[in-house]
Amino acid sequence: MALTNEEILNAVAEKTVLELVELISAFEEKFNVSAAAVAVAAGPAAAAVEEQTEFNVELTSFGANKVAVIKAVREATGLGLKEAKDLVEGAPQVLKEGISKEEGEELKKKLEEAGATVTLK
């Protein structure tokens, strides 16, 4: 005589919490499974990473054309010749901090055209 799903549900509904815990343990042993909650893979909503809005432009190296890079740094930062030269020769150095992505990309492009190696962080 096979039990219907309805009969099984009624039998489970009549049990106490302690009896249900024992029943679950018996199922785990009999079928060699675990009743632990399965971790659900994080979806896009769960991984709501805040997009970076402020960037730093770092001069990594000045490359082969140091004079052109110094001119580009002076133009971008408004520094004097000596300060710009010291900054370029002291690479890696942060040229600008807390700027927008667009401004950072534009500055990076100008410096790379002058021969520098630049990173946007």
From Swiss-Prot:
Gene3D superfamilies: 3.30.1390.10, Single helix bin. CDD domains: Ribosomal_L7_L12. One of its GO terms (molecular function) is mRNA binding. Keywords: Ribonucleoprotein, Ribosomal protein. The keyword Ribosomal protein applies. One of its GO terms (biological process) is translation. The keyword Ribosomal protein applies. It comes from the Bacteria. GO terms for cellular component: cytosolic large ribosomal subunit. Homodimer. Part of the ribosomal stalk of the 50S ribosomal subunit. Forms a multimeric L10(L12)X complex, where L10 forms an elongated spine to which 2 to 4 L12 dimers bind in a sequential fashion. Binds GTP-bound translation factors. Forms part of the ribosomal stalk which helps the ribosome interact with GTP-bound translation factors. Is thus essential for accurate translation. Belongs to the bacterial ribosomal protein bL12 family. This is Large ribosomal subunit protein bL12. It comes from Acinetobacter baylyi (strain ATCC 33305 / BD413 / ADP1).
